[in-house]
A protein has these predicted regions:
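Outer-membrane beta-barrel proteins
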Residues: 186-190, 202-204
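C-terminal subdomain of the subtilisin-like protease fold in secreted/lumenal serine endopeptidases
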Residues: 1, 39-42, 53-56, 113-186
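Short acidic, flexible loop segments centered on an aromatic residue
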Residues: 201-219
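Distinct, well-ordered alpha-helical segments
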Residues: 22-34
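Short, solvent-exposed loop/turn segments enriched in Ser/Thr/Gly
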Residues: 192-199
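Extracellular S/T/G-rich loop segment that most often corresponds to the catalytic His/Ser-adjacent loop
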Residues: 9, 32-113
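Active-site neighborhood of phospho(di)ester-bond hydrolases with catalytic His/Asp-centered motifs
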Residues: 13-17, 43-44
């Protein structure tokens, strides 16, 4: 509840963690909170240069198992061998998602300075400017199949890109209860002769979208 209240007034940023694991039980992982909340920008760590396989995801970084499903780490930021200050007037290069998250927090602060009106430009708008404008970089995870890609932080693009809708399908519920039609059997499947109702969740990751039209098709 505290985070939800804070989200209404501020952009929330959190480190994804350094266990090298995915964020969902679906992938035999476990989420890191608060980074995995939908109203928090969860930050993974990337390397400065790709390895021989073209992978930018830091090996220690937790990673997103299934993107655009509402529970996720949104983007990568530099988090490997990042120079920072230490007590005693010294410097050292440290690695971790805790080094990457401040990069994103700084970009979010710049974006809020660029768009200060919170009524017109909500926290979700700033999250979109930061998380959807940097382009994607290749990431190789332990999952079988092709490599994935994650958005990266880019301060210049976050401050200069024109917002546009970025819609994705998130979730679907199907209802075929007997009360909805004489031919319904309530088994949760679409059978011949049934009258069904669908509840579809579409997520907009970035700019404002008006008069959205969805088309349902079958193979």
């Amino acid at each position: 509840d505290a985070l939800v209240l804070a989200y209404s007034q501020a952009v929330l940023v959190a480190a994804a963690g350094n266990d090298g694991r995915p964020n969902e039980p679906l992938c035999r992982g476990a989420p890191m909170y608060p980074a995995n909340h939908a109203w928090v920008l969860g930050v993974m760590a990337r390397t400065e240069f790709p390895n021989a396989k073209g992978d930018y995801l830091a090996g220690f970084s937790n990673w997103d198992c299934k993107t655009s499903n509402g529970n996720e780490y949104e983007l990568m930021a530099p988090g490997a061998a990042v120079w920072s200050t230490l007590p005693g007037d010294s410097y050292s290069a440290w690695s971790g998602t805790s080094m990457a998250a401040p990069v994103v927090a700084g970009i979010a602060a710049l974006a809020r300075t660029r768009w200060p009106d919170k009524t017109t430009y909500s926290s979700r708008f700033i999250m979109g400017q930061v998380g959807a404008t940097g382009g994607n970089l290749k990431a190789i995870t332990p999952l079988k199949g092709p490599a994935v890609s994650y958005p990266q932080a880019d301060a210049y693009n976050a401050l200069t890109s024109t917002p546009s809708p970025e819609l994705s399908f998130e979730e679907l519920w199907l209802f075929d209860e007997v009360a909805q039609g004489d031919g319904n059997d309530g088994d949760g499947r679409v059978d011949s002769g049934e009258t069904v109702e669908l509840a579809i969740v579409i997520r907009n990751r970035w700019g404002k979208a008006d008069n959205v039209v969805a088309t349902l098709s079958t193979p």
